[in-house]
């Protein structure tokens, strides 16, 4: 059997967090600009920005992000960061990526919501021009934040009409802030008639994913709980929801305690819409090439599986119809 060149495969990524995916060299550059001291040794720095291989919980995993927040407080920093993440993706043959970020986490020093979105989109455009990747931005509301603040952030974001800002998400502490707890914010985003994805099913609570499906949300970040819930999986498939799966991240946070607790094979057998993602390239010390290697190792995923999942990702993406057509053609050619 011919060995698969996982790096060479064309790839699509829908679930990648900006602040969790910065390269060490970019972290150092941003720290220099912000006049923040970092450990000189890369291994020591990595310990601060990469979560433990096994965390006690999702909240422990999220602690790594606190280290990055002070570095992303200017337009310049956000542009550099967005360019860096899209470049990393392009260099492993990702042809389309959606990079998500929370404006709130970059407003500590006076940036407006609009400024954060403009800065991120500028960085993504630079990478698009240089590497030929199509790179788009998603805006996250933080579910644990003050709801009136989040409502204002979402409204200001909705005023931005940039073709590279394509949708919304809610991230953060799912366990304590499930869909019902932030329902007014979800309804607010739905009223915009703009695309939306949603983190649910990462913290072991099937009700949260069920609520997300009932609210009509068609893309779901993680969906890990489907491994344990056959009836919910049936609903997921029946409603045409697409799962943004993040294997390494789920094993770290214990959303999936072992590979057997990860929903991929059950979702595949049920005919669910599946996409493969990194979640956080740096915090999880991964990239899509590594993820594909793991799917092949643990689940015997084939090149045809990867083609199918990438096709699903394009169809579920928030790209324009013209971009989707172009991407589907590029993907078909790459896998022919």
UniProtKB/Swiss-Prot annotation:
Q: Which GO terms describe its cellular component?
A: cytosol
**Gene3D superfamilies documented for this protein:** Metal-dependent hydrolases
Report the EC number(s), separated by commas if there are several: 3.5.4.4
Tell me the protein family, please: Belongs to the metallo-dependent hydrolases superfamily. Adenosine and AMP deaminases family. Adenosine deaminase subfamily.
Q: List the disulfide bonds.
A: none
Q: What class of enzyme is it?
A: hydrolase
Could you tell me the Gene Ontology terms of the biological process aspect for this record? adenosine catabolic process; hypoxanthine salvage; inosine biosynthetic process; nucleotide metabolic process; purine ribonucleoside monophosphate biosynthetic process
Q: Which residues form the active site?
A: 202
On the tree of life, the source organism's domain of life is Bacteria
Protein name stated in the entry: Adenosine deaminase
Q: Which residues bind Zn(2+)?
A: 15, 17, 199, 279
The source organism is Streptococcus thermophilus (strain ATCC BAA-491 / LMD-9)
User: What is the gene name?
Assistant: add
């Amino acid at each position: 059997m011919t060995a698969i060149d996982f790096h060479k495969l064309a790839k699509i990524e829908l679930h990648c967090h900006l602040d969790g995916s910065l390269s060490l060299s970019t972290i150092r550059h941003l720290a220099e600009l912000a006049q923040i001291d970092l450990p000189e040794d890369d291994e020591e720095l990595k310990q601060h920005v990469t979560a433990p291989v096994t965390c006690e919980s999702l909240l422990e995993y999220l602690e790594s992000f606190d280290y990055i927040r002070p570095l992303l407080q200017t337009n310049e920093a956000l542009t550099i960061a967005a360019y860096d993440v899209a470049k990393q993706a392009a260099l492993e043959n990702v042809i389309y990526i959606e990079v998500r970020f929370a404006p709130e986490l970059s407003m500590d020093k006076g940036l407006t919501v609009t400024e954060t979105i403009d800065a991120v989109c500028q960085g993504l455009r630079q990478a698009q021009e240089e590497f030929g990747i199509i790179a788009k931005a998603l805006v996250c509301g933080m579910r644990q934040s003050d709801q009136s603040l989040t409502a204002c952030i979402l409204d200001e974001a909705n005023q931005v009409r940039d073709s590279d800002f394509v949708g919304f998400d809610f991230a953060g502490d799912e366990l304590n802030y499930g869909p019902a707890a932030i329902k007014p914010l979800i309804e607010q985003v739905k009223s915009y008639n703009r695309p939306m994805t949603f983190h649910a099913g990462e913290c072991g609570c099937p009700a949260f994913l069920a609520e997300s499906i009932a609210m009509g949300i068609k893309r779901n970040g993680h969906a890990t709980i489907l491994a344990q819930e056959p009836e919910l999986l049936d609903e997921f498939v029946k409603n045409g929801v697409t799962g943004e799966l993040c294997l390494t991240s789920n094993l770290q946070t214990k959303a999936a305690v072992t590979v057997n607790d990860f929903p991929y094979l059950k979702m595949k057998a049920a005919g669910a819409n599946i996409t493969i993602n990194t979640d956080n390239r740096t915090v999880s010390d991964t990239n899509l090439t590594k993820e594909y290697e793991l799917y092949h190792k643990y689940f015997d995923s084939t090149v045809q599986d990867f083609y199918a999942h990438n096709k699903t990702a394009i169809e579920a993406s928030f790209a324009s119809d013209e971009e989707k057509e172009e991407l589907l053609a590029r993907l078909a050619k790459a896998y022919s």
